[in-house]
Amino acid sequence: MESANASTSATTIDQLCKTFNLSMHTLQINCVFCKNALTTAEIYSYAYKHLKVLFRGGYPYAACACCLEFHGKINQYRHFDYAGYATTVEEETKQDILDVLIRCYLCHKPLCEVEKVKHILTKARFIKLNCTWKGRCLHCWTTCMEDMLP
């Protein structure tokens, strides 16, 4: 799948599939971190999260679910700037909270309006990691809360 044009033009799973005339179901792509092949479910999840494809040595790479979560945690510990409520995010970005691209700090999915509103209603803070605002998606929110239960 090596191609000079692909490495410069295809930045998403969808674009990669179109460039090489493949379906997501038949695409085989490795994790940039652990080098294992992504499962079909991980490929669909990666595309759903609007994450970018990386090229190394002319070959495309993505990230498996395990490595995404692992590196999300590492990023949280290494690059934590500060935490703030929705008003802080709005003041800093000069945008309405619903218009700001905020990703989950664990799975990296873009937060939808419902997830942002949940942060506001529960008075949960967004966190700024490496100069980028992050939050928790509903899936990871539930997972985090389960860890707190006896």
Curated annotation (Swiss-Prot):
Please name the GO terms of the biological process aspect recorded for this protein, alphabetically. Answer: DNA-templated transcription; regulation of DNA-templated transcription; symbiont-mediated perturbation of host apoptosis; symbiont-mediated perturbation of host ubiquitin-like protein modification; symbiont-mediated suppression of host innate immune response; symbiont-mediated suppression of host type I interferon-mediated signaling pathway
InterPro entries documented for this protein: E6, E6_sf
Entry-linked Pfam families: E6
Q: Which UniProt keywords apply?
A: Activator, DNA-binding, Early protein, Host cytoplasm, Host nucleus, Host-virus interaction, Inhibition of host innate immune response by virus, Metal-binding, Modulation of host cell apoptosis by virus, Transcription, Transcription regulation, Viral immunoevasion, Zinc, Zinc-finger
Where do the zinc-finger regions (unnamed) map?
31-67, 104-140
Write down the superkingdom of origin.
Viruses
Q: Which GO terms describe its cellular component?
A: host cell cytoplasm; host cell nucleus
Q: Give an example GO molecular function.
A: DNA binding
Where does it live in the cell?
Host cytoplasm; Host nucleus
On whether Zinc-finger is a keyword of this UniProt record, the answer is yes
- Ion transport listed as a keyword: no
Q: Which family does it belong to?
A: Belongs to the papillomaviridae E6 protein family.
Assembly and interaction partners: Forms homodimers. Interacts with ubiquitin-protein ligase UBE3A/E6-AP; this interaction stimulates UBE3A ubiquitin activity. Interacts with host TP53 and EP300; this interaction inhibits TP53 activity. Interacts with human zyxin.
Task: Give additional notes from the record.
Answer: Belongs to the low risk human alphapapillomavirus family. The cancer-causing human papillomavirus E6 protein has a unique carboxy terminal PDZ domain containing substrate but low risk E6s do not possess this domain.
Role played: Plays a major role in the induction and maintenance of cellular transformation. E6 associates with host UBE3A/E6-AP ubiquitin-protein ligase and modulates its activity. Sequesters tumor suppressor TP53 in the host cytoplasm and modulates its activity by interacting with host EP300 that results in the reduction of TP53 acetylation and activation. In turn, apoptosis induced by DNA damage is inhibited. E6 also protects host keratinocytes from apoptosis by mediating the degradation of host BAK1. May also inhibit host immune response.
| Protein name listed in UniProt | Protein E6
Q: Which organism is it from?
A: Human papillomavirus type 6b
* UniProt lineage: Viruses, Monodnaviria, Shotokuvirae, Cossaviricota, Papovaviricetes
Q: Which gene encodes it?
A: E6
